Regions:
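Bacterial N-terminal signal peptides
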Residues: 27-37
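Gly/Pro-rich loop segments of beta-rich domains
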Residues: 45-60, 71, 75, 86-99, ...
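Structural WD40 beta-propeller signal
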Residues: 65, 104, 145-147, 188, ...
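Conserved beta-propeller blade signature
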Residues: 69-71, 108-111, 150-152, 192-195, ...
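Short glycine/acidic-enriched loop and turn motifs that connect beta-strands
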Residues: 77-78, 116-117, 158-159, 200-201, ...
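Short loop/turn segments that connect beta-strands within beta-propeller blades
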Residues: 82-87, 122-127, 164-169, 206-211, ...
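Blade-level signature of beta-propeller repeat domains, shared across WD40, Kelch, NHL, RCC1
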Residues: 275-315
């Protein structure tokens, strides 16, 4: 005797058969089949190389503007500008250990200078001007409060977070023994800051009053940078060559790489990465951009590459 599920399946088959003879319905079925095929291909997060190898210094921060241009610092003298199609040019020069960066509310690029203990402002034409020249100690990651315009900088050498007012005044915002070369820094949508350490595998939460607390443990080694997109953080595991996703409740999931170093495009654990560091989100779609250090830390010339991550479909 047929059960309810059998009746439902039989009804579906009859409707499917009658639909097949309708040209409009066949067109709809074709569209749906293409959508399902696309969804199956995009079932896993995947990565592809966006640029050819760039000869330079090393890997600093990455940020993306509102029209999709990617700005990549080389931890040396330069910031590169790369279009979403992969065309690249030098955007700015004359920096001193160009590390983390972010675009402020005026559309200018704020660029940390690790060796110069400073932050510079770079306009849309690539003109570099000093912004902060004192009060920082090995600045790396930059995060901006979009409501106030205040800037927060991770001081790697100083194991602290500095706050920079819109007029350039620097004050101490957070200091803790939990910091171990704080490197990447990002806001959530509630005004909390999140920081990842370069010298260990800890992700920390800093509340709006500057109180620091453990948040998540990621991978087994030091971390690079992080970005926040659609209620998720995406973190580069610099020393273990992986990318991780972290939810707002602290759940950690590896989405790219298997811990083995290399430059291999692909999905999930089949992809290979090489010292991924900077990471930033595209203004549209589920895309991220990272930079990676291609050669060994001692070999010359130093070379880097920029790659695009396409996140799996939202669940």
């Amino acid at each position: 005797m047929a059960n309810d599920s059998d009746e439902i399946q039989m009804g579906a088959r009859i409707k499917f058969a009658s639909c097949f003879y309708s040209s409009r319905c066949r067109a709809l079925m074709l569209v749906l089949s293409l959508l399902f095929a696309t969804a199956s291909v995009r079932g896993q997060t995947k990565i592809r190389s966006l640029t050819n190898v760039i000869e330079g210094h090393a890997v600093g921060g990455v940020t993306v503007d509102l029209v999709g241009n990617i700005y990549v610092a080389d931890f040396g003298d330069f910031v590169w500008k790369i279009t979403p199609e992969g065309k690249r040019d030098v955007f700015a020069s004359g920096l001193y250990g160009a590390s983390g960066n972010a675009i402020d509310n005026e559309g200018k690029l704020l660029q940390s200078n690790f060796y110069g203990n400073s932050v510079t402002k770079i306009d849309r034409n690539g003109q570099v001007k000093p912004f902060v020249t004192t009060g920082l100690s090995g600045p790396v990651g930059i995060a901006i409060n979009r409501q106030t315009g205040d800037v927060y900088v991770a001081n790697c050498r100083g194991n602290s977070i500095a706050k920079i007012a819109t007029d350039g005044t620097v004050s101490s915002f957070a200091k803790s023994d939990l910091f171990s070369c704080p490197n990447g820094i990002s806001f959530d949508h509630g005004g909390n800051l999140y920081v990842v350490n370069f010298r260990d595998n800890k992700m920390l939460k800093v509340d709006p009053k500057g109180a620091v607390a453990p948040f998540a443990t990621i991978s087994k080694k030091g971390l690079g940078h992080l970005c926040f997109k659609e209620d998720r953080f995406y973190v580069t595991a610099f020393h273990s060559h992986e990318i991780y996703e972290v939810t707002l409740d602290g759940a950690v999931r590896r989405i790219l790489g298997d811990g083995k170093r290399g430059i291999v495009d692909g999905a999930g654990a089949k992809a290979r990465l090489s010292f991924p560091n900077g990471i930033a989100s595209s203004p549209w779609g589920r895309r991220l951009y990272i930079n990676e250090y291609v050669n060994s830390e001692s070999s010359l010339p130093r070379r880097t590459i920029v790659r695009e991550i396409v996140l799996e479909a939202a669940k």
